[in-house]
Protein backbone atom coordinates (compact mmCIF):
# COMPACT_ATOMS: atom_id res chain seq x y z
CA UNK A 1 0.00 0.00 0.00
CA UNK A 2 2.57 2.59 1.07
CA UNK A 3 4.99 1.55 -1.65
CA UNK A 4 2.49 2.60 -4.33
CA UNK A 5 1.09 5.69 -2.60
CA UNK A 6 2.42 9.00 -3.90
CA UNK A 7 3.11 10.93 -0.70
CA UNK A 8 3.90 14.25 -2.35
CA UNK A 9 0.63 14.99 -4.11
CA UNK A 10 -1.99 17.74 -3.77
CA UNK A 11 -4.40 15.54 -1.81
CA UNK A 12 -1.92 15.21 1.07
CA UNK A 13 -1.13 18.90 1.58
CA UNK A 14 -3.20 19.20 4.73
CA UNK A 15 -2.62 15.70 6.07
CA UNK A 16 1.15 15.42 6.02
CA UNK A 17 3.90 17.36 7.71
CA UNK A 18 7.19 17.02 5.85
CA UNK A 19 10.53 16.98 7.66
CA UNK A 20 13.63 18.04 5.72
CA UNK A 21 16.98 17.53 7.43
CA UNK A 22 19.68 19.90 6.23
CA UNK A 23 19.75 23.38 4.79
CA UNK A 24 22.42 22.95 2.17
CA UNK A 25 21.67 23.21 -1.51
CA UNK A 26 19.47 20.10 -1.64
CA UNK A 27 17.73 20.61 1.72
CA UNK A 28 16.98 24.31 1.26
CA UNK A 29 15.73 23.79 -2.30
CA UNK A 30 13.54 20.85 -1.27
CA UNK A 31 12.07 22.68 1.72
CA UNK A 32 11.40 25.85 -0.31
CA UNK A 33 9.85 23.93 -3.21
CA UNK A 34 7.60 21.87 -0.94
CA UNK A 35 6.61 25.03 0.92
CA UNK A 36 5.71 26.73 -2.37
CA UNK A 37 3.50 23.73 -3.19
CA UNK A 38 1.56 24.31 0.02
CA UNK A 39 2.93 21.61 2.31
CA UNK A 40 3.81 22.25 5.97
CA UNK A 41 7.56 21.74 6.14
CA UNK A 42 9.81 21.43 9.17
CA UNK A 43 13.43 22.09 8.20
CA UNK A 44 16.23 21.13 10.57
CA UNK A 45 19.60 22.86 10.27
CA UNK A 46 22.58 21.09 11.83
CA UNK A 47 24.95 24.05 11.39
CA UNK A 48 24.93 27.35 13.26
CA UNK A 49 23.54 29.04 10.16
CA UNK A 50 21.81 27.61 7.09
CA UNK A 51 24.41 29.35 4.89
CA UNK A 52 27.34 27.32 6.26
CA UNK A 53 26.73 24.33 3.99
CA UNK A 54 29.54 22.76 1.99
CA UNK A 55 27.57 23.26 -1.23
CA UNK A 56 29.41 26.57 -1.49
CA UNK A 57 32.51 24.66 -2.65
CA UNK A 58 30.99 23.73 -6.05
CA UNK A 59 32.44 26.42 -8.29
CA UNK A 60 32.61 25.13 -11.86
CA UNK A 61 28.97 25.15 -12.89
CA UNK A 62 26.02 22.85 -13.58
CA UNK A 63 25.64 20.69 -16.66
CA UNK A 64 22.27 20.55 -18.41
CA UNK A 65 21.20 19.41 -21.87
CA UNK A 66 19.48 22.65 -22.94
CA UNK A 67 21.07 22.69 -26.43
CA UNK A 68 21.19 26.50 -26.60
CA UNK A 69 23.98 26.52 -29.17
CA UNK A 70 22.32 23.95 -31.46
CA UNK A 71 25.33 21.68 -31.25
CA UNK A 72 23.32 18.47 -30.98
CA UNK A 73 23.23 18.21 -27.21
CA UNK A 74 20.70 15.77 -25.81
CA UNK A 75 19.79 13.92 -22.65
CA UNK A 76 21.60 10.85 -23.96
CA UNK A 77 24.82 12.78 -24.67
CA UNK A 78 24.75 14.30 -21.16
CA UNK A 79 24.13 10.83 -19.75
CA UNK A 80 27.03 9.36 -21.72
CA UNK A 81 29.46 12.14 -20.74
CA UNK A 82 28.50 11.85 -17.08
CA UNK A 83 28.87 8.06 -16.94
CA UNK A 84 32.16 8.24 -18.85
CA UNK A 85 33.42 11.03 -16.58
CA UNK A 86 32.72 8.82 -13.57
CA UNK A 87 34.82 5.99 -15.06
CA UNK A 88 31.65 3.93 -15.58
CA UNK A 89 31.19 3.52 -11.81
CA UNK A 90 27.99 5.55 -11.48
CA UNK A 91 24.59 3.93 -11.23
CA UNK A 92 23.30 4.45 -14.76
CA UNK A 93 19.60 4.65 -13.90
CA UNK A 94 20.26 7.53 -11.50
CA UNK A 95 22.53 9.33 -13.96
CA UNK A 96 19.92 9.03 -16.71
CA UNK A 97 17.21 10.42 -14.42
CA UNK A 98 19.48 13.32 -13.48
CA UNK A 99 20.13 14.01 -17.18
CA UNK A 100 16.37 13.98 -17.82
CA UNK A 101 15.61 16.56 -15.13
CA UNK A 102 18.71 18.71 -15.69
CA UNK A 103 16.79 21.36 -17.65
CA UNK A 104 14.17 21.63 -14.91
CA UNK A 105 16.92 22.01 -12.29
CA UNK A 106 18.42 24.96 -14.17
CA UNK A 107 14.95 26.51 -14.55
CA UNK A 108 14.29 26.06 -10.82
CA UNK A 109 17.60 27.72 -9.94
CA UNK A 110 16.78 30.68 -12.20
CA UNK A 111 13.33 30.95 -10.58
CA UNK A 112 14.99 30.98 -7.14
CA UNK A 113 17.08 33.95 -8.22
CA UNK A 114 20.47 32.44 -9.05
CA UNK A 115 22.30 34.99 -11.25
CA UNK A 116 23.72 32.73 -13.94
CA UNK A 117 25.94 34.36 -16.56
CA UNK A 118 23.97 35.54 -19.59
CA UNK A 119 24.73 36.27 -23.22
CA UNK A 120 23.97 39.68 -24.72
CA UNK A 121 20.68 38.35 -26.09
CA UNK A 122 19.51 37.43 -22.58
CA UNK A 123 19.86 33.65 -22.84
CA UNK A 124 21.83 31.82 -20.18
CA UNK A 125 25.48 31.56 -21.16
CA UNK A 126 27.12 28.15 -21.14
CA UNK A 127 30.63 26.91 -21.70
CA UNK A 128 32.57 23.76 -22.32
CA UNK A 129 33.88 22.41 -19.04
CA UNK A 130 35.62 19.18 -18.14
CA UNK A 131 35.42 16.36 -20.65
CA UNK A 132 32.04 17.29 -22.11
CA UNK A 133 31.51 16.85 -25.85
CA UNK A 134 29.54 20.11 -26.13
CA UNK A 135 29.11 23.39 -24.25
CA UNK A 136 26.54 22.65 -21.58
CA UNK A 137 27.92 24.02 -18.29
CA UNK A 138 25.86 26.87 -16.84
CA UNK A 139 27.84 29.01 -14.42
CA UNK A 140 27.78 32.13 -12.28
CA UNK A 141 31.18 33.75 -12.91
CA UNK A 142 33.32 31.38 -10.83
CA UNK A 143 31.01 31.54 -7.81
CA UNK A 144 28.42 29.00 -8.89
CA UNK A 145 28.25 27.13 -5.58
CA UNK A 146 27.89 30.30 -3.55
CA UNK A 147 25.22 31.73 -5.86
CA UNK A 148 23.26 28.45 -5.89
CA UNK A 149 23.35 28.29 -2.10
CA UNK A 150 22.28 31.93 -1.75
CA UNK A 151 19.44 31.39 -4.23
CA UNK A 152 18.20 28.32 -2.36
CA UNK A 153 18.57 30.09 0.98
CA UNK A 154 16.64 33.15 -0.21
CA UNK A 155 13.83 30.89 -1.50
CA UNK A 156 13.85 29.11 1.88
CA UNK A 157 13.75 32.46 3.72
CA UNK A 158 10.75 33.57 1.65
CA UNK A 159 8.87 30.41 2.62
CA UNK A 160 9.86 30.81 6.29
CA UNK A 161 8.47 34.36 6.20
CA UNK A 162 5.26 33.15 4.51
CA UNK A 163 4.89 30.51 7.22
CA UNK A 164 4.86 27.32 5.16
CA UNK A 165 8.34 26.31 6.37
CA UNK A 166 9.42 26.26 10.01
CA UNK A 167 13.20 26.40 10.37
CA UNK A 168 14.87 24.78 13.37
CA UNK A 169 18.47 25.77 14.13
CA UNK A 170 20.59 23.85 16.70
CA UNK A 171 19.49 26.31 19.40
CA UNK A 172 15.80 25.67 18.73
CA UNK A 173 16.14 21.87 18.60
CA UNK A 174 15.83 21.77 22.39
CA UNK A 175 12.33 23.28 22.18
CA UNK A 176 10.88 20.30 20.29
CA UNK A 177 8.44 18.07 22.09
CA UNK A 178 9.90 14.78 23.22
CA UNK A 179 7.02 12.57 22.06
CA UNK A 180 6.66 13.32 18.35
CA UNK A 181 5.58 10.53 16.03
CA UNK A 182 6.95 10.00 12.54
CA UNK A 183 4.49 8.17 10.28
CA UNK A 184 6.71 7.68 7.26
CA UNK A 185 10.19 8.59 6.15
CA UNK A 186 10.89 9.25 2.47
What are these regions (language model features)?
Residues 13-16, 37-40, 59, 161-164:
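Short coil/turn connectors at secondary-structure junctions
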Residues 175-178, 182-186:
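Single conserved hydrophobic/aromatic residue that forms the stacking wall/gate
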Residues 11, 23-24, 183:
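Catalytic-site beta-strand/loop segments enriched in glycine and acidic/polar residues
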Residues 30-31, 53-54, 185:
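Short glycine-/acidic-enriched loop or helix-start segments at secondary-structure transitions
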Residues 1-18:
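Extreme N-terminal leader/targeting segments of oxidoreductases
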